[in-house]
Amino acid sequence: MAATLLARACGLVRGAPWPWGWRRLHTVYQSVELPETHQMLRQTCRDFAEKELFPIAAQVDKEHRFPAAQVKKMGELGLMAMNVPEELSGAGLDYLAYSIAMEEISRGCASTGVIMSVNNSLYLGPILKFGTKEQKQQWVAPFTSGDKIGCFALSEPGNGSDAGAAATTARADGDSWVLSGTKAWITNAWEASAVVVFASTDRSLHNKGISAFLVPMPTPGLTLGKKEDKLGIRASSTANLIFEDRRIPKDSLLGEPGLGFKIAMQTLDTGRIGIASQALGIAQAALDCAVTYAENRSAFGAPLTKLQAIQFKLADMALALESARLLTWRAAMLKDNKKPFTKEAAMAKLAASEAATAITHQAMQILGGMGYVKEMPAERHYRDARITEIYEGTSEIQRLVVAGHLLKSYRS
C-alpha cells in the first residue's frame, strides 16, 4: 500500500489553478528539507486535494454531506490508515508523513481532514498500540480501505476536559460487558462502523477505573443522537452515542481493565498532531485565498499587496503559520523517534489552532465584504478554524499540559 501511495505521486495530473483559494506553494516547505519520500507524498496529497476535494468542499459543507466517494479514494491511496503496518493493509508510513498528508487534505477540505484524522489517530491508533493480534485483525484491517471508518467516544454531556469523570458504565456480567450511558460530540458518528468507547468499570477509582472497549456500529442497544448543526466542518457528522444496556463480548475490552484513561491520554497526544496539521491546512488555505485576492484587487490605483497595511498582515500570517508548522513537525518526529512528545504535541496543537483562528480572521479582513459571503472560501475557512481550538483538548487544556511539563522540568 505504501508503495502504491508513493508511486502515484508522479501519476496524478495537476489541474488548472483556481482564481480564489488555491495557490502553488513554492517556499512554504523550504525551512526544513523533507526526505524525498515525504516530498512525493506531499505532492500526491496536494494534487488529490486540488482535484478531488477543493471543488466539492463548499457544496458538502452546505449540504452537511459526508464525502463518501472521496474518502474511498483516500483509502485506495493509503491515507485512511497511514501508520498501520502493511501486513494489516495499511500504508506503513511515519507520523511526519501523516502530518504532511493531513495538512494537504485539510487545505482542500477541512471536513475531510477531520474524518481522516479520527480514523487514523483516534480509532486505529489505540487498537494498534493496545490491541491483541485478534483485535487488530478484526478491528483494524477492515478499516484501512475507506469502505469503513471508525470513531472515538470519550466526551460526555457532563464532562469534556475531565475525561476521568465518565458517567458511562461497563458492568461485567458473565461472559459479557454491559454498557450504559451517553457519549457526546462524537466525530464520524453517523458513518462509523465501529467505536472505541470509554466507560467506568469502577467509579470509586475515578480515572483508574476507566476502561476502553471496541463496539461495532450500528448495533442493538446503541442509538445515534441527532446530527449536530455546527458552525464549521459541516461535512463531518457529530452526534451523541446512547448506550442502553448494550451487551458486548468480554474480548471487546481493549487493553486491561482500568487502562482506559491511559489509552485515552496517549491517543489524544497523537490526535493533537493530527488536529494541529488540520489547522495548518485551514490556515494555509486562508492565506492562499488572501494573497490571491490581494494581488487581483486594486485600491488607490494599485494592487492591495502594494499597501503596507496588507503586507504587514500577510507577514504576520506567514510567520504564525510557518512557526506552527515547525512545532507540529517536531512533535511528529519526536513520536517517530519514540521520544516523549506530549508537551510538544500540546504546543503544536495550541500554536496551530490559534494560528488558524488568527489567519482566517485576517484573511476575511483583507477580503473585506467579499470575505463575508459564501461565494468565497474565506468565510468557510473562518468557520472551520474555530473548532480546532476546542476538540481533542481545548487551548486551555493545552496550556495546562505545557505548563505542567515545563514546571516539572525545572523541578527535576
From Swiss-Prot:
pH dependence: Optimum pH is 7.1.
Family matches, as CDD domains: SCAD_SBCAD
Phosphothreonine carried by residues: 27
CC cofactor note: Binds 1 FAD per subunit.
Modified-residue entries (N6-succinyllysine), positions: 51, 129, 262, 306
Residues where N6-acetyllysine is found: 51, 72, 129, 208, 262, 306
Chief site of localization: mitochondrion
Signal peptide region: none
Residues that, per the record, bind substrate: 161, 269-272, 393
Residues reported in the UniProt entry to bind FAD: 152-161, 185-187, 297, 308, 365-369, 394-396
Residues at the catalytic site: 392 (proton acceptor)
EC numbers, comma separated: 1.3.8.1
Function description: Short-chain specific acyl-CoA dehydrogenase is one of the acyl-CoA dehydrogenases that catalyze the first step of mitochondrial fatty acid beta-oxidation, an aerobic process breaking down fatty acids into acetyl-CoA and allowing the production of energy from fats.
Family statement: Belongs to the acyl-CoA dehydrogenase family.
Protein name, per record: Short-chain specific acyl-CoA dehydrogenase, mitochondrial
Highest classification ranks of the organism: Eukaryota, Metazoa, Chordata, Craniata, Vertebrata
